[in-house]
Amino acid sequence: MSEVSKKSGDVTVTELTEDGKLVRKIRSFVRREGRLTKGQESAMDNNWSTMGIDFAQQMLDWKEVYNREAPIVLEIGFGMGASLVEMAKHAPEKDFIGIEVHSPGVGACLMGAEETGLTNLRVMCHDAVEVFDYMIPDGSLETVQLFFPDPWHKTRHHKRRIVQPAFAEMLRKKLKIGGTFHMATDWENYAEHMVEVMNAAPGYKNTATDGDYIARPDDRPLTKFEARGHRLGHGVWDMKYTRTE
């Protein structure tokens, strides 16, 4: 059973067992409301019917979504969407779907997709974990991307980090055998946490050949934020795991 409680404008669903014990659920985000610019709002109005997917408790049919069969790349938390649009532009042979809860980011992504004339990109504005639970067919994803998620750097907040054992198992089921989970972070402590979780997760193999990390792949665009970090001497850690079973 569940109880719904409202807190700071957000809705939290608390799952309970039959004897009243709390079941901690994974959460992929902390909601951040924001105001859309006129351009973002216009992009939402003009493009949602063709590029937006509404949340529903029903599995997606990728062939129906994209009107073709192609490898599916899913990104969790794409921010303002610039990198996702860039990746979709340079890989027209693949189909991309981005999930983001920040509506201005979704609007900005649709603006970029419209300006670029993309037909291989879809977006959702919802909690990624619920989307995975209810809408993503098992064994259907070629790649899952998680770039620069909230590091929750305070020790007492580490339990809020999205990369946890249950999350790794959920993703494993949705990836194809041989599919990849690509992560990137600019927090070394979070990178270490990611490696610790993923190295222990069954059914995955770290693709790094020397140590735990890989060089930034050419297909992951260098963001302005990341380039600035490089100039200031800040590190970025990329990790890629394949589903083996």
Curated annotation (Swiss-Prot):
Keyword tRNA processing carried by entry: yes
Reaction(s) catalysed (UniProt annotation): guanosine(46) in tRNA + S-adenosyl-L-methionine = N(7)-methylguanosine(46) in tRNA + S-adenosyl-L-homocysteine
A Gene Ontology cellular-component term: tRNA methyltransferase complex
Record-listed S-adenosyl-L-methionine binding positions: 75, 100, 127, 150
This protein's UniProt keywords: Methyltransferase, S-adenosyl-L-methionine, Transferase, tRNA processing
Main EC class the enzyme belongs to: transferase
Binding site for substrate: 154, 186, 223-226
Catalytic residues as annotated in Swiss-Prot or TrEMBL: 150
EC number, UniProt record: 2.1.1.33
One Pfam family here: Methyltransf_4
The protein's annotated pathway: tRNA modification; N(7)-methylguanine-tRNA biosynthesis
Record bears the keyword Cell inner membrane: no
GO MF annotation, one: tRNA (guanine(46)-N7)-methyltransferase activity
UniProt family annotation: Belongs to the class I-like SAM-binding methyltransferase superfamily. TrmB family.
Family matches, as PANTHER family: 3-DEOXY-D-MANNO-OCTULOSONIC-ACID TRANSFERASE/TRNA GUANINE-N 7 - -METHYLTRANSFERASE, PENTACOTRIPEPTIDE-REPEAT REGION OF PRORP DOMAIN-CONTAINING PROTEIN
Its biological purpose: Catalyzes the formation of N(7)-methylguanine at position 46 (m7G46) in tRNA.
NCBIfam families: tRNA (guanosine(46)-N7)-methyltransferase TrmB
Record-given protein name: tRNA (guanine-N(7)-)-methyltransferase
Gene: trmB
